[in-house]
């Protein structure tokens, strides 16, 4: 049977196709693709055709494909100005795999990371006092800068950071406008601020580097990743890496883990506050669990079922990445439809995670869907995809889950939280490829008593 033409979603008659709709309501656009076209449909993103896959069979093709067939590098033009040339998304598949196999994410390191995360949380809340109010985006974005830098680069580097690094990093993430598919260097405000923020981060890292060079560590045990990179020499005997290159490496190492953990932590707390029965169950679970006197570094690596189910349901409803992109490097057929070389091929956690045939009452918050016998995450391995799936499952998934468990093992045992604005007012800002919580996103806290 010969392949049939790819169906195209309605609309998109402007010069850049569906780009403006993708900038303003990407989830609405992608849901319309599924509703009108089924598991395989297309929309137009500037000069590129995007083949959006959804549903189990189409997603399986997407997640099983290797880099030789579907390549990430050219699918994210907005990343090169952020990372710099030659870093991760601008590198070859082999180099990316080498970079992403970060020793810090290996299992034997996790216990130390859990203790580090607990320490960072306690430092962040040290001046909270008995009661107050925070903005979730501000708080968790700064906290996860400190946790990710401490765990992935080293506590020594983290201790030389302050709130400036977090603010600049946030501005960098705001520079991921889909207009990058037209030109990632367009003279628009968010790209100008992106470039200024990156220059600011390079200046901060260069300042730290200069201090390290002036006072090199005398003891090997006192070295972190920055010291190691500074010490690497080229054949000429000069430093192998510039401050710009090292900053790019650090940005790339922290990038996926930072915004995913920040957003997921925020939404986990929002959903707990929206659903007081789930909140009470998690509090009871944590109080009983930590009643044995053991540390966060012990329990965060073990099962915390109620909290984990809340986390899974939060990830299903609010996936930190709403679309995953690749570029087709050959001709392929998916469910009778032909994909051509050069096409952008996409999968959408935001759409697949809410397919009603796989997830009954898909828009409802139901942590029990992960309990036996339902286990909807395991049953639907190609549509429960907040971390991707198959060979492209996120390398940091275990770290991300452990981090959230460690964060809430501290926060929920120390403080009670309640919403400071209407429940429906908490929402994501989808105007950028890196999804952020929209502000304001305020909550009130009060120290727990009698614990």
Curated annotation (Swiss-Prot):
Subcellular location field: Cytoplasm
Positions with a binding annotation for heme b: 72, 76, 97, 326, 392, 394
Catalytic reaction(s) noted: a 14alpha-methyl steroid + 6 reduced [2Fe-2S]-[ferredoxin] + 3 O2 + 5 H(+) = a Delta(14) steroid + formate + 6 oxidized [2Fe-2S]-[ferredoxin] + 4 H2O
EC number(s) recorded for this UniProt protein: 1.14.15.36
Molecular function (Gene Ontology), one example: sterol 14-demethylase activity
Gene3D superfamilies assigned: Cytochrome P450 (1.10.630.10)
Cellular component terms per the entry's GO annotation: cytosol
Obligatory cofactor(s): heme b
UniProt keywords, alphabetically: Cytoplasm, Heme, Iron, Lipid biosynthesis, Lipid metabolism, Metal-binding, Monooxygenase, Oxidoreductase, Steroid biosynthesis, Steroid metabolism, Sterol biosynthesis, Sterol metabolism
Biological processes annotated in GO: sterol biosynthetic process; sterol metabolic process
Regulation: Inhibited by alpha-ethyl-N-4-pyridinyl-benzeneacetamide (EPBA) and 4,4'-dihydroxybenzophenone (DHBP).
Homology family: Belongs to the cytochrome P450 family.
Subunit structure: Homodimer.
PANTHER family xref list: 24-HYDROXYCHOLESTEROL 7-ALPHA-HYDROXYLASE, CYTOCHROME P450 FAMILY 7
Function: Sterol 14alpha-demethylase whose physiological substrate is not known. Accepts electrons from the iron-sulfur ferredoxin Fdx encoded by an adjacent gene. In vitro, catalyzes C14-demethylation of lanosterol, 24,25-dihydrolanosterol and obtusifoliol, to produce the 8,14-dienes stereoselectively.
Name of the featured protein: Sterol 14alpha-demethylase
């Amino acid at each position: 049977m010969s392949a049939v033409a790819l169906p195209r979603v309605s609309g998109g008659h402007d010069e850049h196709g569906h780009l403006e709709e993708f900038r303003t309501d990407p989830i609405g656009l992608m849901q319309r693709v599924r509703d009108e076209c089924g598991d395989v449909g297309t929309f137009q993103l500037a000069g590129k055709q995007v083949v959006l896959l959804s549903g189990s069979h189409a997603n399986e093709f997407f997640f099983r494909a290797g880099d030789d067939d579907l390549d990430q590098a050219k699918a994210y033009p907005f990343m090169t100005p952020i990372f710099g040339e030659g870093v991760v998304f601008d590198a070859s598949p082999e180099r990316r795999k080498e970079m992403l196999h970060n020793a810090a994410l290996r299992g034997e390191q996790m216990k130390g990371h859990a203790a580090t995360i607990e320490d960072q949380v306690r430092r962040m809340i040290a001046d909270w006092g008995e009661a107050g109010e925070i903005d979730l985006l501000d708080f968790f974005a700064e906290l996860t800068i400190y946790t990710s830098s401490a765990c992935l680069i080293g506590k020594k580097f983290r201790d030389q950071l302050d709130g400036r690094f977090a603010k600049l990093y946030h501005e960098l993430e705001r520079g991921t406008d889909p207009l990058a598919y037209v030109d990632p260097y367009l003279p628009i405000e968010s790209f100008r601020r992106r470039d200024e923020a990156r220059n600011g981060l390079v200046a901060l890292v260069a300042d730290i580097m200069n201090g390290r060079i002036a006072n090199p560590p005398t003891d090997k045990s006192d070295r972190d990743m920055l010291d190691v990179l500074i010490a690497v020499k080229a054949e000429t005997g000069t430093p192998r890496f510039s401050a710009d290159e090292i900053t790019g490496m650090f940005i790339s190492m922290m990038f996926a883990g930072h915004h995913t953990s920040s957003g997921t932590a925020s939404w986990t707390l929002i959903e707990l506050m929206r659903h007081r029965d789930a909140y009470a169950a998690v509090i009871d679970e944590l109080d009983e669990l930590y009643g044995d006197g053991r540390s966060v570094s012990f329990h965060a690596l073990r099962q915390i079922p109620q909290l984990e189910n809340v986390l899974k349901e939060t990830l299903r409803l609010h996936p930190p990445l709403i679309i995953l992109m690749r570029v087709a490097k050959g001709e392929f057929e998916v469910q009778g439809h032909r994909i051509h070389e050069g096409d952008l091929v996409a999968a959408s956690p935001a759409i697949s995670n809410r397919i009603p045939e796989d997830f009954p009452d898909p828009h409802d918050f139901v942590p029990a869907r992960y309990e036996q016998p339902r286990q909807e995450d395991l049953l639907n391995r190609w549509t429960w995809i907040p971390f991707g799936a198959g060979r492209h499952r996120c390398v940091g998934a275990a770290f991300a889950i452990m981090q959230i468990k460690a964060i809430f093992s501290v926060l929920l045992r120390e403080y009670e939280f309640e919403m400071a604005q209407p429940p429906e007012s908490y929402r994501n800002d989808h105007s950028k490829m890196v999804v952020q919580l929209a502000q304001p996103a305020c909550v009130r806290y009060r120290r727990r008593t009698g614990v």
